[in-house]
C-alpha cells in the first residue's frame, strides 16, 4: 500500500454518530447527530473519504426554548437533533432529522451547503427517517419494525 493512502483510525478525532454520507460530483459530504451542541448539524467535506474537514453547520440554534438557550435552569443535554439524512436533488440540498427535546421533525433545504438554510417543521417524531426522490416526487420513509412512507 502506498504511504500516501495509509490512514490510521480514528480518521476523525471526535464522535460522529449516525453518519450519513452523499457524493456530489467529486466531493463527499457527511452529516452526523450533534444532539444538544450548537451550532448544530455539522456538515463535513472530503474528497477521498479519509481526510475530512468541517465545512459548515445547518443552524446556530434550532429553537429558542429554555432548554436550548440554557435558561431557567434547563438544558437539552443528550437531546437535540438526531439521525440526520442529507440528500441532493436537482441542484438543492435537503436535510431532515428529529429533535428529541421538541418532539418534531425538521426539514431544511438550501442550494448551497453553506446556506442559508430554509427551515420547515413537520409535526410528528419520525425518528431515523430518510428522504427518497422518485420521478419528481419526494417521500419520507421511517420506521423500525415496520416501514412507513409519506
Show which residues each predicted segment covers.
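Carbohydrate-active catalytic/glycan-binding domains of CAZyme proteins
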Residues: 1-150
Amino acid at each position: 500500500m502506498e504511504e500516501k493512502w495509509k490512514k490510521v483510525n480514528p480518521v476523525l478525532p471526535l464522535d460522529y454518530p449516525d453518519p450519513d454520507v452523499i457524493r456530489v460530483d467529486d466531493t463527499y459530504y457527511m452529516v452526523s447527530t450533534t444532539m444538544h451542541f450548537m451550532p448544530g448539524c455539522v456538515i463535513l467535506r472530503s474528497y477521498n473519504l479519509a481526510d475530512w474537514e468541517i465545512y459548515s453547520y445547518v443552524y446556530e440554534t434550532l429553537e429558542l426554548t429554555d432548554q436550548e438557550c440554557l435558561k431557567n435552569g434547563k438544558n437539552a443535554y443528550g437531546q437535540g437533533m438526531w439521525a440526520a439524512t442529507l440528500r441532493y436533488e436537482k441542484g438543492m440540498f435537503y436535510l431532515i432529522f428529529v429533535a428529541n427535546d421538541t418532539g418534531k421533525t425538521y426539514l431544511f433545504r438550501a442550494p448551497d451547503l453553506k446556506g442559508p438554510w430554509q427551515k420547515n417543521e413537520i409535526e410528528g417524531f419520525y425518528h431515523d427517517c430518510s428522504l427518497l426522490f422518485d420521478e419528481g416526487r419526494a417521500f419520507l420513509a421511517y420506521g423500525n419494525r415496520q416501514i412507513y412512507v409519506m
